[in-house]
Design a protein with these regions (language model features):
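Glycine/small-residue-rich loop that forms an oxyanion/phosphate-binding "nest" at active or ligand-binding sites
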Residues: 83-89, 93-95
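Short, contiguous alpha-helical
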Residues: 62, 115, 244
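Residue-level signal for inorganic ion chemistry
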Residues: 46, 177, 202, 243
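Metallo-beta-lactamase
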Residues: 30-32, 37-39, 109-201
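Conserved beta-strand hairpin/beta-sheet module of binuclear metal-dependent hydrolase folds
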Residues: 1-51, 124-136
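C-terminal regulatory/interaction regions
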Residues: 204-248
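Active-site metal-binding motif and surrounding structural segment of the metallo-beta-lactamase
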Residues: 40-84
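Histidine-centered divalent metal-coordination motifs
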Residues: 61-67, 118, 177, 239
């Protein structure tokens, strides 16, 4: 089975790295995983890859703007587009996807895997035949995933989602940011160990009487500038919330 085509969304930045990935799964029902942000060069690149055929479907991993906001531009190019995500109360114009729903994609079949933690509506898409995972914002090489406490992020859910992905035994992962991940199980184990290490650092701060979240960020990370500092603060808040949840 052919690998998906990586089509960058063209939105580099401090929190998106080189920018978002979208993944075109070609075949009988051409399917795009994630919608990007609607930039014209990205939409044109999708059309060029399709060679005049219509894009049949878009599967969005979660509702964050860098993954979902391009849907209007895609619909403008392909009006009959089947757009799907895990629908929340404020979502409009999407067909709903739920955990373990099966969806045709190219010549393959994907299974939606609900993986909350980074976002409550986060889905990964699993190609069991290829043992390939479309990972969204669950995994990314060379960095860790932000857990945005107060904006739907939940560290306990994220760790449980990592365990669920590990149980699938993926051989390759196609992430929402960064290059293809050739050893996703190793990365999942590294992420779990990293979160355990970070929790121990937070606990050490609390035991030393450092309880202000901004002070904890400064002690653990050193000097950061926004927006990276805000991202670190949200993740520290997620660790503090996990500690509170598990102490009651």
């Amino acid at each position: 089975m052919a690998s998906p085509i990586q089509l960058p969304a063209g939105n580099p930045g401090p929190l998106t790295g080189a920018g978002n990935n979208t993944w075109l799964i070609d075949g009988a029902e051409p399917t795009l995983v994630d919608a990007g942000v609607g930039l014209a060069p990205h939409v044109d690149a999708i059309a060029a890859a399709l060679g005049g055929r219509a894009l049949a479907r878009v599967l969005v991993t979660h509702g964050h703007a860098d993954h979902a906001s391009g849907i209007d531009a895609l619909r403008a190019r392909w009006p009959d587009l089947d757009a799907r995500k895990l629908v929340q109360d404020t979502d409009r114009g999407w067909r709903d996807l739920r955990d373990e729903h099966r969806i045709a994609a190219g010549d393959a079949e994907l299974v939606a895997i609900h993986t909350p933690g980074h976002a409550p509506d986060h889905l990964c898409f699993w190609d069991a035949d290829a043992r390939a995972l479309y990972a969204g914002d669950m995994l990314a090489l060379g960095t860790t995933v932000m857990i945005p406490a107060g904006r739907g992020g939940d560290l306990r859910q994220y760790l449980a989602s990592l365990d669920r992905l590990a149980a699938l035994g993926p051989l390759v992962a196609y992430p929402g940011h960064g290059p293809v991940i050739d050893r996703p199980l190793d990365l999942i184990r590294e992420y779990i160990a990293h979160r355990a290490m970070r929790e121990q650092q937070v606990l050490a701060c609390l035991q030393e009487g450092v309880t202000d979240p901004d002070a904890i960020v400064a002690k653990i990370y050193g000097e950061l500038v926004d927006p990276v500092r805000r991202a670190a603060r949200m993740t520290i808040d997620a660790h503090l919330e996990k500690i509170r949840q598990e102490s009651t």
